[in-house]
Structure formats: C-alpha cells, structure tokens
Amino acid sequence: MKVNYTKRLLHFKEPAGTSRGVYTTHLSYYVIVEQDGVKGVGECSTLPDLSCDAMPESRYESLLDQACHFVEQTGGIPYEMLRPYPSILFGLETAFAQLDAKGSWALSSTPFGRGEEPIRINGLVWMGTFEEMYDRLEKKLQAGFHCVKLKIGAIDFDRELELVRHIRACFS
C-alpha cells in the first residue's frame, strides 16, 4: 500500500464572511491511498479559527506525514491518534471508502451520490451587505433548501432580523 498527499490552494468564488473574518482562499490536502493499482482519494480540510483541528501548516503536514506512514506500515487508519483531528480522519476514511469501491467516485448509490439531487438541509448564507445576504438567501430558498444558516454579525442587528422575518414569511 502506498499513501501520500498533495495540497492545493483553493479560491472562493466570492469572499466568505464569518464571525472570525473573511475567507478568500482555502488550503486543502488530498490524501491518496493506492493498492494494487486502485486509488482512493480523500480531502483533509480545515478553516482557520473555525475548525477544531486548524493549526499551523507545518504542524498539520507533520500529522499528515505520521498518519500516512502509519497507514503504509499497517494498512489501517490510526483512529486513536486522529480522534482530535477529524479533518484528517475524514480524509483517510473517504480515501479508504473509494479504495473499497475499487476506485469509483460513486461512494453511495443515492440520488445525491449519483449527482441527481442536492442535499437541501443546510443552505449556508455567508456574511455580507444586507443586499448580498438577501440575494443569497433568496437563491437558497428558490433552490428548495428547508434549513438555512445565516452567518450574522456583519450588518446591523435589526437588518439581520429583517432577513429572519423574510424566511418566516416564506414558510407561514
């Protein structure tokens, strides 16, 4: 079994405002597990100041190195070592799931897994101006989301309540 990872700097389509700041880029790691010519890929990803296992890049890569070495030596995931680091655990579990699926990207045969339907349970609306948030909210509601999460704190509280009243009016 061969295990390694690669990192990519991803760019948000538009700035993502949170209570901890605004994100324009996102560093993500992809773990690749290969056995008998079959590859499994899993994403290990955190958001600084939001994810419980966010840390300096060098420390994160050191943990990834240790986890990859363990997997290569044992053929298994070091669950106890990775419990405090759910992003790395998720990436390895996803890579193994794809490996078990003989390299197929279709990890589950569901409408979502086949790309036929989205999961409409958490439509996230990032912080922005009132108009930006209202437009994003409208798009989520039109897309059929039944649960919408608003990132609040960027605008006047009364204006944020206006957004909540709008949601309630749509479902009354």
Where in the sequence are the language-model features?
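N-terminal capping/lid subdomain adjacent to the active-site entrance of alpha/beta enzymes
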Residues: 1-172
